[in-house]
Amino acid sequence: KIRRMYVNNGGDISFWLNYGSAFTIGVVDNPQRPELNTKVCLPYESPVRGLATSGWRGRSQSLGIADAVTVLAPSSACADAAATLIANNVNIEHPGIIRKPACDVKDDSDLGMHPVTVKVPFLHEKEVSQALQNGAESAKALIRKNKIQSAYLSMQKQTLVIENT
């Protein structure tokens, strides 16, 4: 009898659970320094069946400055789109943030000339907090529309968790 199944497509994860089963995930904020930053256990009763992470340090390009935004949603497609949107909105204006046209960073980028983040300096706590709050507003809007269940936002050792309560 199969208790659970999952498919991991480079961090976008879809899963199925049988009655009485659970799926535990670990979240890593910085892929350059992989360490387990938090864990989440998703029981069968949870509406979550997909998760995804996005951020400027990841394999995909980002318009924002989040180290990582992990989203739990009813499907991995919803989680992927939401994580990208929220991570793009974890942002502030700062002269030390370096952005380049996406096509200059990756030849095959579908973002063309859109500026993507390539370097984020150490920011003051208030600046990090403001950037995270900007992303949190996007997460709250998606929760209100029942598109996602929760979002974990991380930047320079600060985290914010937004949940559907």
Task: Indicate where each model-derived feature is located.
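Mature catalytic core of soluble alpha/beta enzymes
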Residues: 1-165
